[in-house]
Curated annotation (Swiss-Prot):
Protein name: Glycerol-3-phosphate acyltransferase
Membrane topology: Multi-pass membrane protein
Annotated pathway: Lipid metabolism; phospholipid metabolism
Protein purpose: Catalyzes the transfer of an acyl group from acyl-phosphate (acyl-PO(4)) to glycerol-3-phosphate (G3P) to form lysophosphatidic acid (LPA). This enzyme utilizes acyl-phosphate as fatty acyl donor, but not acyl-CoA or acyl-ACP.
Gene Ontology cellular-component terms listed: plasma membrane
């Protein structure tokens, strides 16, 4: 990895470490999303505690955290594999933010933003998959898991040179959802829009 790639990777992690959910909730005088609901600082939990407007703002900001560094690396001519490393760095920043005591979100929106520079056709198909599962089953985590499992295949269809880095990114997201998987299997996972609070130790 050359100096430029290393700088972009570090910048991606630092940008990812800016917790949109926490900052927007502070701005709107909402509860800290790390302490209420699912205890996850992401758009779905902000939807539960703050409504659609706040959730959309968090979603867009989280996506930009992935899009900006990857698009920047793309225009600088960085190799696809290193672009994958940059995307993973942005998601790691979101999941384990240095500015917020390493307590972050699941990385789904940031990963979507990181994939967006590959192409609008791929991005649209990924979003359609998530939306379809979410509408059918009303579980955000299930929609995310199904989507990340099929996204490497979608990538292979459109831009096969990016399949490996996208697969690496998807594996990271599945790992971050291990507690959601356990709650889905036990029937304890809250559905989209539910106000039900989850015990802090189950987040």
């Amino acid at each position: 990895m050359d100096a430029l790639a290393l700088i972009m990777t570090m910048a991606a992690y630092l940008l990812g470490s800016i917790s949109s959910a926490v900052l927007i909730c502070r701005l709107l005088r909402l509860p800290d999303p790390r302490k209420v609901g699912s205890n996850n600082p992401g758009a779905t939990n902000v939807l539960r505690i703050g409504g659609k407007g706040a959730a959309v703002a968090v979603l867009l900001c989280d996506m930009l955290k992935g899009t900006i560094p990857v698009w920047g690396g793309y225009f600088l001519g960085i190799d696809p594999i290193i672009l994958g490393v940059i995307a993973i760095a942005a998601c790691l920043g979101h999941m384990y933010p240095i500015f917020f005591h390493f307590k972050g979100g699941k990385g789904v929106a940031t990963a979507l933003g990181a994939i967006a520079p590959i192409g609008l056709d791929l991005t649209g198909l990924v979003m359609l998959t998530w939306l379809s599962v979410a509408v059918l089953f009303r579980y955000s985590s299930l929609a995310a898991l199904v989507t990340v499992l099929v996204t490497p295949f979608y990538t292979w269809m459109f831009k096969p040179q990016y399949t490996l880095p996208v697969a690496m990114l998807c594996c990271l997201i599945v790992f971050k959802h291990h507690q959601n998987i356990r709650r889905l299997l036990s029937g304890e996972e809250p559905k989209i829009g539910e106000k039900k609070l989850i015990e802090k130790n189950s987040a």
